[in-house]
């Protein structure tokens, strides 16, 4: 009969952690945890050990039976009037403390969904009076944070946990945990985050197990029950969505421009597409949607976002340049997004073009041409000369047919925000790619914590349209604020429903932001106490939210263990007077990307001596900040050998001490040299010279073959025959790389 480790530990009144050590060190039994099973021979061996130690009487231990508790389904709670208190429904009431804890955690982790109740049989045909009951808040049962198995308490560890929350789960006072950590040399507060390893170490003292559990976040639509199931009859063929990827200046935008026969290249800076745009073209009566993603590696996240909404990735590689770093990066994003890749070998019109080299280099990254037995289509094109563009479009349409892409235009629309901005005359504008349904003028829409009503739709040519169907990109005017790029947009039944959803999203994000800010403030305080860590404060301004996100991520990646970038504030729009005042208070530098400071901001910056740096090229900004951070690094020094001196005779000089008569046998010695004294090849002292003389005169430098006299700082035990090594410490310029 098998017995669990914790049962024997309980029997001998020993803590699980100590019991495991005894098993391993003293008895020779290795187990993984308190819940491990022991066979009869092992149990007898343990009993014999403790019998010899004369610790406790041996008692028969019966294995604990596991009783599975039936989970009760959480009831559906309707949203009542604001003054109605429905707190406490659907939560465990086993005991007051546990009920309170369970209630708090469920409120935090339950997934909230909204349902429409207007079609239920019970309410059909009845006129509702009083408060609204057609809008239901449904709670989905969440996994409990604390469970008990075989008499052992198990805490589920999800993501980040504060010390206070962990103490509550353990059922002990926070002060006790703080004291334990203090004795281990860790100073934490009740709001400090704790790591998984810290939690495991602490829990072992209380015979509690920690089980790591990955958080599974439902997306926006699942949380609020906005996803509508498609009927097979409604699914029709839809245009493919294409993302163009590749290295800087390999011709991505030029290729798209050639396909569209419009000029969007001229206004760009530094050869890089700075914003995501989406456009549609037509080939043989079929439409193709192109998403043009930025080409520089700093826009990694924006490119990844483009790959997530795309069906096919076009990898543009210059025939005269071959595979480059951003080419490899683009391949990775396409593979993560699990989308097929078509390689467009561009610039074949150039004399130095070598398409064969491109194919060979891409083979090393898993892209094998269909001609060579692989599954990747290679199309040789020239955007400049408009060579074989039809062949590329045909390849796209053939690939789309194989994928059997379908969409439903007969339901409420769902889309993704590709880009957003605030127009001073029109207001908030969002570039939306419709992914499901049909978006119409007058639709009530929600994207993240922003809502609105569609006032106008503009297609990629800037023409007003009444609706947008699946895979169609449009500019949407009507949001009450600027939505975040990457947010999913949904059409909601009415404005009341939209408002309630936005309120829930706002509350949820506010909780997350508050938690992040608290942790950030604490870590900031710790950093200031830690003198070895230096910080560069920045305020960021850019022309759009997507650019802000890309710039922030690029700059934060420059941080390391010694120097850190701290983003005090980041937003889209012009640099304002308030930005300058904030920078002055925080000791920050203001960075502007594709934006300029206002007149008032410039005057304020001049008075307060706040530095403002602006650029239209993102990598110029990152290079400047990288140089600034490198200057903040503590200098590194390298020892540089100067020479070797042999002591011939030591003279005692009153009021001065011992002076050595020497000869420089190799290299040279300077009057400010660092030295080490060797006796029988053993270093007996290391320090600096106090004096260096030649013919009774002070000397700055003595070279090999010359005699000299020297005195050593704070050392008088020089003897004949000692050897002195002279060296200097040379500062080595450091970089962040």
Curated annotation (Swiss-Prot):
The places in or outside the cell where this protein is found are: Cytoplasm
- State the residue spans of region: G4: 346-349
In this chain, the stretch annotated as G5 covers: 382-384
Query: Which keywords does the record carry?
Result: Cytoplasm, GTP-binding, Initiation factor, Nucleotide-binding, Protein biosynthesis
Annotated ranges, domain tr-type G: 237-404
- For the ligand (GTP), the binding residues are 246-253, 292-296, 346-349
Query: Basic and acidic residues: which segments have biased composition?
Result: 69-80
In its UniProt entry, what is this protein called? Answer: Translation initiation factor IF-2
Please report the organism this UniProt entry assigns to the protein.
Fusobacterium nucleatum subsp. nucleatum (strain ATCC 25586 / DSM 15643 / BCRC 10681 / CIP 101130 / JCM 8532 / KCTC 2640 / LMG 13131 / VPI 4355)
